[in-house]
Swiss-Prot record:
Family: Belongs to the glycosyl hydrolase 37 family.
Binding site for substrate: 148, 155-156, 192, 201-203, 273-275, 306, 507
Catalyzed reaction equations: alpha,alpha-trehalose + H2O = alpha-D-glucose + beta-D-glucose
GO BP terms in the entry: cellular hyperosmotic response; trehalose catabolic process
CC terms in the record's Gene Ontology section: periplasmic space
EC number: 3.2.1.28
Subcellular location(s) per record: Periplasm
The name this protein goes by in its record: Putative periplasmic trehalase
InterPro entries in alphabetical order: 6-hairpin_glycosidase_sf, 6hp_glycosidase-like_sf, Glyco_hydro_37, Glyco_hydro_37_CS, Trehalase_periplasmic
Length: 561
């Protein structure tokens, strides 16, 4: 292992030896791993561009998911022959994804019965896939979100798994953890989803939390079993840190001037996304003052954040082409990295490696100080993202600000201020607003998303802010119930300015199903109703229940220099 430069020994000491060991393990593994599947835009070359630009399908994801019927090289050689017709050519040479059968729930089902009945409907098995398929095989069955999302998605799955656990389907939780561990072992990280075109990026890192969830059922055995994969994922997120100088960024790692290590979202490619090809090209063309590759990278990195798209990443909330995701240090990502470090410490201790546990604790403590120093806006009184270009914390309040509370990284006095800010600026009749900005993007007002409702609810409860937490749950559940009563389905996102309406905006129509909404709804139903009187629907009047969640003892914020 290369020795650190003499000017950096103290800072490098904060990085556990396991990171370097994991890098070595990954490099050895890379020699044994099959060639990484190529995404369709590379496999098909100019043909892919021609088909997407011709807009043969209403959704660009359709052709990205189409399976070539023979070697793509042979298919490409047949293009533009005499009498060539592009639509006919595609129909002959590709198998298009099948539209999912519309699920019609039995009459008279309660909300809980509907969700429990959906788990098998949303379950898929793909142990084997066609040779040229963009779908990546997984060894165990998994639950998909629903609608156009025919594959498993990384961060969606954690909130889906909360619901599976609530329904008693611990076998499915275990299967999905095993699948994600398989992806880490196979590709070195968990991709955005199990598609070849998602391999160049990940998503909010919830794998360690998934293992922690499974450990609620299986005990420390789960932590010990998946410790190697958690370490490998940590190595992926910290890749490049060993050579990073102060003030530099490398892939997903940021080193600030004082040596603080934080993370950002990143995609290894800088081309249009195959699943949104035409849209990305149009976005890049609309801003000739920026290199197209830079815009493509920032679009892809926003997809890696899960928030695609939001004013959070933009200089001008009304212009998507001003997004610059890679120059923003997100508060939610770094909260999740803190949690990953804490769980790695716990798992290392369970495995009997106290020295390694102490190293991860040291890393977590250093990151917590970084969050308090760089991701807190003292003037506004809330957590926010850090801007690498202006070298300042940003002013915008978003629902991501509640992640430090969710992972118990916030100081008590700051959590109290967050509760006030949440109630004043984000709480709406139908739940928690994603932001207070109306940009037309789906991760902005007036949309509310199930995972953010749960993060806020749990986070506020961790700090004894039960009233605001229960307000969020009650408002969101009412929204879900009213929509279900009218449409007999749960949807991907909701308009929280009212109740009973699905959300809008973004690149595609509103999707139903819907994995993470199902999971969060079950958790919230069991939160608001007393255990001795569980509810199958949201009650007409708010129950006077007491949560079993106890606030975690917190310390006051340390003054930042």
């Amino acid at each position: 292992m290369k020795s650190p430069a003499p000017s950096r020994p103290q800072k490098m000491a904060l990085i556990p030896a396991c990171i370097f060991l994991c890098f070595a393990a990954l490099s050895v593994q890379a020699e044994e791993t099959p060639v990484t599947p190529q995404p369709p835009d590379i496999l098909l070359g100019p043909l892919f561009n021609d088909v997407q630009n011709a807009k043969l399908f209403p959704d660009q994801k359709t052709f990205a998911d189409a399976v070539p019927n023979s070697d793509p090289l042979m298919i490409r050689m047949q293009q533009n022959q005499s009498g060539f017709d592009l639509r006919h050519f595609v129909n002959v040479n590709f198998t298009l994804p099948k539209e999912g059968e519309k699920y019609v729930p039995p009459e008279g089902q309660s909300l809980r019965e509907h969700i429990d009945g959906l788990w098998p409907v949303l379950t898929r098995s793909t142990e084997n896939t066609e040779k040229w398929d963009s779908l990546l095989p997984l060894p165990e069955p998994y639950v998909v979100p629903g609608g156009r999302f025919r594959e498993v998605y990384y961060w969606d799955s954690y909130f889906t798994m909360l619901g599976l656990a609530e329904s008693g389907h611990w076998d499915k939780v275990a299967d999905m953890v095993a699948n994600f561990a398989h992806e880490i072992d196979t590709y070195g990280h968990i991709p955005n989803g199990n598609r070849s075109y998602y391999l160049s990026r990940s998503q909010p890192p919830f794998f360690a939390l998934m293992v922690e969830l499974l450990a609620q059922h299986e005990g420390d055995a789960a932590l010990k079993q998946y410790l190697p994969q958690m370490q490998k994922e940590y190595a992926y997120w910290m890749d490049g840190v060993e050579n990073l100088q102060a003030g530099q960024q490398e892939k997903r790692v940021v080193k600030l001037q004082d040596g603080t290590l934080l993370n950002r979202y990143w995609d290894d490619r800088d081309t249009p996304r195959p699943e949104s090809w035409v849209e990305d090209i149009a976005t890049a063309k609309s801003n000739p003052n920026r290199p197209a590759t830079e815009i493509y990278r920032d679009l892809r990195s926003a997809a890696a954040s899960g928030w695609d798209f939001s004013s959070r990443w933009m200089d001008n909330p009304q212009q998507l082409n001003t997004l610059r995701t890679t120059s923003i240090v997100p508060v939610d990502l770094n909260s999740l990295m803190f949690k990953m470090e804490k769980i790695l410490a716990r798992a290392s201790k369970a495995a009997g490696d106290n020295a390694m546990a102490n190293q991860y604790e040291t890393l977590a403590n250093a990151r917590q100080k970084g969050i308090e120093k760089y991701l807190w806006n003292d003037q506004q009184g809330w957590y926010a993202d850090y801007d690498l270009k202006s070298h300042k914390v940003r002013n915008q309040l978003t629902a991501a600000a509640l992640f430090p509370l969710y992972v118990n990284a916030a100081a008590k006095d700051r959590a109290n201020k967050m509760a006030t800010a949440t109630k004043t600026h984000l709480l709406q009749p139908g739940g928690l607003n994603t932001t207070s900005v109306k940009s037309g993007q789906q991760w902005d007002a007036p949309n509310g998303w199930a995972p953010l409702q749960w993060v806020a609810t749990e986070g506020l409860q961790n700090y004894g802010q039960k009233e605001v937490a229960m307000d969020i749950s009650w408002h969101f559940l009412t929204n879900v119930q009213h929509t279900y009563d009218r449409e007999k389905k749960l949807v991907e996102k909701y308009d929280v300015s009212t109740t009973g309406t699905g959300g809008g905006g973004g690149e595609y129509p509103l999707q139903d199903g819907f994995g993470w909404t199902n999971g969060v709804t079950l958790k919230m139903l069991d939160l608001i109703c007393p255990k001795e009187q569980p509810c199958d629907n949201v009650p007409a009047t708010r129950p006077l229940s007491e949560s079993t969640t106890q606030p975690v003892k917190q310390k006051e914020a340390e003054p930042t220099p």
